[in-house]
Amino acid sequence: MAPLLGRKPYPLVKPLSEPPGPGEEVYTIEHTKEAFRNKEEYEARLRRYGERIWTCKSTGSSQLTHKEAWEEEQEVTELLQEEYPVWFEKPVLEIVHHNTVPLDKLVDQVWVEILTKYAVGEKCDLMVGNDKTLSVEVVKIHPLENPPEENAEKKMEGACDSPSSDKENASQENLKKEPQSKEEESRRESLSDRARRSPRKLPTTMKEEKKKWVMPKFLPHKYDVKLVNEDKVISDVPADNLFRTERPPNKEIMRYFIRHYALRLGSGESAPWVVEDELVKKFSLPSKFSDFLLDPHKFLAENPSTKRKSLSSPEGKPRKRLKNVETGTGGEGAKGDKKKNKDSQNIPLSPTIWSHMQVKKVNGSPLKMKNSGTSKKSDEENVLGTPKSSKKQGDKKSSDPKRRRKSGLNKTPNSQRLSKKEDKSLGGAKKPRMKQMTLLDLAKSPAAAGSPKKQRRSSTTGSAKLGKPFPPMALHLLRFYKENKGKEDKKTTLSSLLSKAAKALSPEDRSRLPEELKELVQKRWELLEQKRRWALMSEEEKQSVLKQKRQEVKQKLREKAKERREKEMQVRREMSRRYEDQELEGKNLPAFRLFDMPEGLPNTIFGDVAMVVEFLHCYSGLLMPDDQYPITSIALLEALAGEKAGFLYLNRVLVVLLQTLLQDELAEGYSELDMPLSEIPLTMHSVSELVRLCLRPSDAHEEESARGSDDWQSGADFDDMVSSEFLEKLETAEVFELDPQEKVSLLLALCHRILMTYSVEDHVEAVHQKSAEMWKERVATLKEANDRKRAEKQKRKEQMETKTDGDVLIKAEKKKESTVKKETPKVLPKEEPEPEDMISTVKSRRLMSIQAKKEKEEQERLNKVRMEKEAEEERIRRQKAATEKAFQDAVTKAKLVLRRTPLGTDRNHNRYWLFSDVVPGLYIEKGWVHESIDYSFTLPPEEEPVLTEEEEEEEEVKKEEETEDGEKEDEGSIISASNDISQQGAPSHESSIETTVPKQGQNLWFVCDTPKDFDELLESLHPQGVRESELKIRLQINYQEILHSIHLTKKGNPGLKTCDGHQELLKFLRSDIIEVASRLQKGGLGYLEDTSEFEEFEERVKTLEKLPEFGECVIALQESVIKKFLQGFMAPKQKKKKKTGGEESTTAEEVDDQKKLAEEARVATAVEKWKTAVREAQTFSRMHVLLGMLDACIKWDMSAENARCKVCRRKGEDDKLILCDECNKAFHLFCLRPALYRIPAGEWLCPACQPTIARRSSRGRNYKEDSEEEEDSEEEDEEESEEEDSEEEHRNTGHSLRSRKKVKTSSKSKMQKKPAKPASRSASKTDTNPSKTSPKSSAKPKSRAAPSSPVDIDELVRQSSKPPSRKKDVELQKCEEILQKIMKFRHSWPFREPVSAEEAEDYQDVITSPMDLTTMQGKFKSSEYHSASDFIEDMKLIFSNAEEYNQPSSNVLTCMSRTEEAFVELLQKSLPGVSYLRRRTRKRAATPSDNSDDDDDDEEEDERSKKQKNGKQGKKASSKRKVEHSRTEKYQTKQK
């Protein structure tokens, strides 16, 4: 198998006879695997293979390269292996081998052959009985007993014995045959069509329908078949009992098969097909060359007298007349006798013999007579008889093997009686011209049909009317052109004849030729004349002629281009004209499906739901930064429709919205019972009441007066969406109990309220700023690339100029050398051949090896350079792709935070919407115009100045340019999405074309959710409509996005989790009350000290069902809290304690009794209001909110669970921890100086709280100063006697109650609800039974546990220095591993080393406790960490310091957040039992606090507030920037 060169296969190079040596290089062609030792032969063969001169043998495709033709043949080979059954190979190749018919007829012939006969080896089904089949294989085909062709032949010969009725019989047979021919033709066409698309088994119903195509019946052969599963042979099985199991190949596969395995030798019509030798031997195909002696041309050449007699027969046998073209008349002659006499030489060529020679069946395959092709066809068309039936009959003969002999014998048309030799004799004018009879002559003399008639000369177009005869060359050209006009394989011969005629004929002879031929000959003569003149020209003349021709060609191209541009401009002008859509006629818009809403929801609210979901998606970076599950429209619709299924999902949406709203400055004035709403815990169970409190109109009015800005006036109208009646309804009902319409209006009101917050404004500004930065980077990158291209172009231009100058010099030198060489060869002496000895051979080999080595090194160097260049290009490409992706993302985000606008409107003013992926599909909105929308357009002016054509063209060109600029601006601008509704249509110059307005009606939403509907919509939109043209452009631009969105609609929506809202609220209210009580009891903050009392309280809460019962329980819980541990509006007003001792101190101002009474009354009133609200609560969410207020008013940071040693800052070892009875600070016994050996009896005061007189001056730490610094900002008042009494009473239970300080409400007082850990604290519960407590024991101070015996100080020190337990060792090892990983984390670079004074001058002033990762490593080495909690506290300190010192937009904070995320992830993997919770630093001005906390965060906050008051903000900001810059530089230097 190899591609053809011309018409012959091109042989491949034989493989190498010997394998190559170790150092020998072999050149191999990739696709053919041909190997060459000679590089020149290899390159020559490659060049040959690269030319487009090859033809694919299997498909016939020409003008291919060798590789393309080779690959096509490989594809055809694979196709035939898959599609062509092996049992059809032999019967088809037997027909093809040595056949001479064209390919199309050959394909028809073999295709019908395999359709009407089973092949040997074919597997089929044998029908046994009515319903049983057996799988069999054909092993033998029996020949037909009585072939129908022979019977038909005998019958037709018997019908045509009478010589007198020759003509009549022929005409009758033609009339009878014509309908049969048409029927056969239609049957054959349907058969070939059915073969391509029929299944493997035909349905039985096809036999009954006469009008439909039916598979041709199998010939009545009998077959011997062999059972597949058994070794048995069944003989003489009729064809009707066999059924094919595999469909035979179609005509196209058959065509590929014949081309692939056979080749036609020669270009003539009788050229035989020859099968490959291997297949001839494999299938033993018979040769048919002996039958080629029956060629009719050879027969006529051996019988010249027959030919002459047939032309001028005096016996009176009429001949067929040629058709007169000018008059349109024709004639025909009578037939001669049909008897065959092979011995006589004077018998004319009868139609029977002619048909035998024209269609001869040799070994089952017909042979086509070698003739001139078109001459026969033209003669057939010129005969007056039945040309259509003749044509169809001829086709039928060549394609239907069953009826070939029958039709060939007796149904030969009249057109076949005129031979080609006669035609040539008439055309050549060498014989005396015969008169041709017409039908009129025959009609006048019917009796003389057998006698010779007087012949008349017929006028033909090919003969000249002048007396001077044509030269032989002209006659030969005329005859050849007439016979072979339009034939592809005769073009070369015709071209050579034209050239000869152009040279031989004179101008007069050329002018006498027919018009078509005269034009061809004249062109060829002009071409030859031009070549002759070109050969006589000098070089200068040739250059001038070429230059002139080039100019002419350029001028023609310019003119054509100008005409094309004018036509395109005209088309563009016409297409750019816009008309009112409803005035245009076009396709109807497709009918879209109404969007399916869940049961109970009207279709009109879909727009509002889509707005809410789209708002949540567009602002997901602000509203849901860490949420992995987006809120979709389908899920939200289901949540709105169902109560049980929608409780969790709807409340989640409300929590997301309120989280942003309550944290904004806009909501600072939102409060309830003098407590800001932001301080109340926001959960799924309290959100319903918090929504009501946020949407109260009073808050909006207060905020309006507070802001005093005009933009609030426009937003205040959104409060009208939630009426007062609706808010009153929310007081008695939960959100999930509302109607769907009310739920949607609630969500809309929240969205509009959030849109007016400062957070949204900052978010939009940040997104746009990022987009602008990306745009600047993109512009800079493009500019840099353009500059680089410009520089490369300039450099290339300079190199070209240098190269041109060099080429001129080289040419001049070469010219000189050539002239010298021409002169010197005669003078040069004869060179003697150098002797070929061993030394010269070795030397030449060494030189060749050195040269090869150099070439190899050069090649390696070039490969290395090329690979480096490719790697650099790949890196640049990836970088560009990443930059482009980042830019597109930034632009997309910037567009998302703006107002979503529709894609456009159609002729009926329906709007088309494409949302994000959370609202999949393309939506159509009808009835969107209502009374509040002012839709208007400007009518065109009535009178316009009349413009000339040129002015009109200029005006249109300007308009087009303006339109294009406007479109570019609209696409490129981000803010263009926020245009007004009236500007959504066409550009401004086209807006005046509109003459219709949208009609008001019901707002309905339709959806386009299939690609077919979308494509139909695109086709139906009119491109010249003022609205639909813009809509079509937008749809085409977003085509892929719309298809993606349509595809998302097919995905199933997971159902929502069902949940009973009432039971959920009830369950969590019980758990929250129990949790608060548990924390009070474990932290020693309330009176629920007895375990049995707490368990009784817990059991009582679990049985509660009604809200009033829960209210009484919550009130009882509030009353059980020790008053000194209350804060906020529940905190009692305390007296400031007087300082004692000899030190000078400023005396606090005495509080006026009236002010004190007023303050007490205010507190009592606030608490009473809260209790009243608890008793009157009508919803569980309201009760959750009021319980959250109580939780926020408890000082949880004063709980005993949070006790931490003031000296070492560590928790743990509770039995060695003692609490001060004055300030509630904790100390380890062994951390005090001097250390304590045992828990002292009675009250114990820490060194900071001891009186000054009782203390001696110490060189150690100044605890008094520490305490004073902590208490500078506190306001203390003396407590009332009642409080002291309660304090005394509570002391009997084992507690030492001290005067606590009131802490102003802040975010630190709000604790997240979580189950309290059980703590074995004996300091707060030395004895749970008060009756058994002695006065001595009650006088003991607070301690973790009273030791049973006195403890020696050495023992305490030994215990303190004792190594930690094994579990703590494992935890610390894991902590050290975490630290090592954090050190290697790429974003931790700002925290690896301490901040020096050079980097930030004021860092030590702002940050009181600096910490870094290197210092922590040092702590691990020196074993300063005793537990994982110490390590976590230092990590918190690093992050808190970074938050406090750096500005919000700095890179350090970004690195901090990523480092903290990585740390939390590592901590959860390594230490899953250790929790991590860090309080975020509030960026608010700190207010004086009444209480000093143990935690370092409070001290740092006080320090920050003091520094801010001292006016160091500016210095701090500059230092932040400075440290950030210096740290970034350091990091970049290390990276490099």
Swiss-Prot record:
Function text: Atypical tyrosine-protein kinase that plays a central role in chromatin remodeling and acts as a transcription regulator. Involved in DNA damage response by phosphorylating 'Tyr-142' of histone H2AX (H2AXY142ph). H2AXY142ph plays a central role in DNA repair and acts as a mark that distinguishes between apoptotic and repair responses to genotoxic stress. Essential component of the WICH complex, a chromatin remodeling complex that mobilizes nucleosomes and reconfigures irregular chromatin to a regular nucleosomal array structure.
Record field: transmembrane: none
First and last residues of each zinc finger (PHD-type): 1202-1252
Cofactors, names only: Mn(2+)
Domain annotation DDT: ranges: 603-667
Biological processes, Gene Ontology terms: chromatin remodeling; DNA damage response; post-translational protein modification
Compositionally biased intervals (Acidic residues): 941-955, 962-972, 1266-1287, 1491-1502
SUPFAM superfamilies listed in its UniProt record: Bromodomain, FYVE/PHD zinc finger
GO molecular function, one term: zinc ion binding
Biased composition (Polar residues): 344-355
Broad class of the protein's primary localization: nucleus
UniProt name for this protein: Tyrosine-protein kinase BAZ1B
Subunit architecture: Interacts with smarca5/snf2h; the interaction is direct and forms the WICH complex. Component of the B-WICH complex.
PROSITE patterns: BROMODOMAIN_2 (PS50014), DDT (PS50827), WAC (PS51136), ZF_PHD_1 (PS01359), ZF_PHD_2 (PS50016)
Domains as described in the record: The bromo domain mediates the specific interaction with acetylated histones.
Region (Disordered): 144-207, 304-470, 557-579, 785-839, 940-973, 1256-1371, 1477-1536
Domain Bromo, chain residue ranges per copy: 1366-1470
